[in-house]
UniProtKB/Swiss-Prot annotation:
It comes from the Eukaryota. This is Conotoxin Cal6.23. One of its GO terms (cellular component) is extracellular region. It comes from Californiconus californicus (California cone). GO terms for molecular function: toxin activity.
Length: 53
């Protein structure tokens, strides 16, 4: 049961992080995959893991 709770919290944190990152990227007029440290380090897949990288 504890493991499930930990996983749920991790997913919520990562999702919030993804949304914040996406907002930050669009504010700067950049998109996932373009060269920018905040906007995903050059790979659209990395965009979703920018907070853990």
């Amino acid at each position: 049961m504890k493991l499930t709770a930990v996983l749920m919290v991790a997913v919520l944190v990562l999702t919030a992080c993804q949304l914040i990152t996406a907002n930050e990227c669009s504010r700067k007029g950049e998109w996932c995959g373009l060269e920018s440290v905040l906007c995903c380090n050059g790979g659209s897949w990395n965009c979703w893991f920018v907070c853990t990288a």
